[in-house]
């Protein structure tokens, strides 16, 4: 009951108290392992893999294209209805959550073993295919673990405690998959590092076999509000869902086919060269954003318009009678309904909101995949040095940035903090531009504050200062952005709306990585860092517009309250 008391009082334990609590309860102990199982593949596939490729002299344009596997995490909500509803043959006796977890964890173990048996210099297409399979398996595992956490929560293991323990396990995995992997790479080969990580992943299957599962009946009997009188007709919803689905399928096919062609060694029949990443991004990038963001918003707005005019709505309850119909309702709730509510509540202001969401973290997302190649290959730091600076020291700097963001939010408010976060996130890229250009400004800063007198050589101090600036800015901006997303999310659709909007954060940055990698290959790191800092001004502009929009909305709301109060006083006077 200690866990329940802590959750009720709001005193969620941390650090060693949290670990002690996790080891004292079956569900919390398994949640700790599941957090590790979720964090390890993400760290290895999205971050550490780029260190391996950079050291083995894979060009940055190729690394950028391969980084598109991260889109699997951004858009895992697309197949979450399938994972939630479909029973896996021959594994059903394990339960609806454990059966999916076993498949994902076996695939992830095979992924790391498969990568360890591949040479990306000679088998890039095969290497990329294995990484793609691993990313989809990892993203699917995240969906299942999130559902399991909610399903098994009870008084002895409240969801707040389970969530904290999940984050604890995730951070342990980030240290092992990041810092430990880099340290090991200085002593053994990269293939051996990934084989060892495959062994760690295989151990998580034991926790899955020991985990309790949840019954399906209660969810399957639940009648969706989408089937009640006054809702849009299922037939029309199916048409809208089909339109949105086709847009998503086209976007996924376009990105996937380009990845296959480039990483598989295909050449342009006219030029005789590999496909140009920059040309692809300029030609298809805007259309991909239109198909995955603008088209669903238009469909959602159309349904709002029809519902307001009582067109094509149910006149009586019409419960779903098949698994396919329930899955369609679930997909509609994940893809269209959250945007529909946002459009209805904000109106045309949704254009500003979506623009802000798409651009706010772009300065971090668009070049993050090249951080390890930059440190290890360009600047010639060792794996031990990068492990300490990025994965240990950098974590504390990020936590400091988050604390600063929280303090600013409490003192100066949401929108000023959001604006400052956008500015410092863009400006932090200029620190890396200086580092890539010889660190003249960084050296001056270090000497002014005598930072090179604390037992570190100036070369290491440069890296620590750059990572400090980037991580503090990123932590501040991240805290401000999470607070902003939470503020615009409807309580009615909190989970699905937040998941959808937060996933859009990664879209533009992920699509732009390949073009950024190609640009670095051609003109070097420093000009690209300056350009990404300039791109960050787009987010600054959207924050200013959103600040104006929210101020006007608050003014209108205040005026409405005054009019209502005046009307109430007049009514009281008439009664008297």
What residue spans do the PLM features occupy?
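Intracellular loop-helix junctions on the cytosolic face of multi-pass helical membrane proteins
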Residues: 1-25, 116-128, 154-356, 543-576
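Short amphipathic helix-loop junctions that connect adjacent transmembrane helices
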Residues: 47-63, 261-280, 360, 369-387
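Loop-to-transmembrane helix entry/capping segments in MFS-fold secondary transporters
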Residues: 60-61, 150, 154-165, 383-385, ...
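Transmembrane alpha-helices of Major Facilitator/SLC transporters
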Residues: 72-79, 291-301, 386-410, 421, ...
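Helix-to-loop junctions at the C-terminal end of transmembrane segments
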Residues: 76-93, 185, 400-420, 520-521
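C-terminal ends and interior cores of transmembrane alpha-helices
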Residues: 100-121, 423-456
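Intracellular juxtamembrane helix-capping segments at the cytosolic ends
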Residues: 139-153, 475-490
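A late C-terminal transmembrane helix in Major Facilitator Superfamily
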Residues: 395, 488-522
